[in-house]
Amino acid sequence: MVTIRLARGGSKKRPFYHLTVTNSRNARDGRFVERVGFFNPIAAGAEVKLSVNQERVSYWLSQGAQPSERVAQLLKDAAKAAA
């Protein structure tokens, strides 16, 4: 099953996540099909906290990809911010 989920990056105590489209059987930070955005939970000041390529996300959702719980919430927040 294809999922849209977060892959952790960054360094110790400074998390940074990529929104990736991947096979659900692959490792969390392993092989992916496409990166469709990023999430920086500790963004401060003028730094961008969330960036999502809505066009590609809607394509993958139409192809049957399932977002993880956290990604579904982030997509909802991104749609609200864009409106």
Curated annotation (Swiss-Prot):
<keyword id="KW-0689">Ribosomal protein</keyword>
<dbReference type="InterPro" id="IPR023803">
    <property type="entry name" value="Ribosomal_bS16_dom_sf"/>
</dbReference>
<dbReference type="GO" id="GO:0015935">
    <property type="term" value="C:small ribosomal subunit"/>
</dbReference>
<dbReference type="GO" id="GO:0003735">
    <property type="term" value="F:structural constituent of ribosome"/>
</dbReference>
<dbReference type="GO" id="GO:0006412">
    <property type="term" value="P:translation"/>
</dbReference>
<comment type="similarity">
    <text>Belongs to the bacterial ribosomal protein bS16 family.</text>
</comment>
<dbReference type="GO" id="GO:0005737">
    <property type="term" value="C:cytoplasm"/>
</dbReference>
<dbReference type="InterPro" id="IPR000307">
    <property type="entry name" value="Ribosomal_bS16"/>
</dbReference>
<dbReference type="Pfam" id="PF00886">
    <property type="entry name" value="Ribosomal_S16"/>
</dbReference>
<keyword id="KW-0687">Ribonucleoprotein</keyword>
<protein>
    <recommendedName>
        <fullName>Small ribosomal subunit protein bS16</fullName>
    </recommendedName>
</protein>
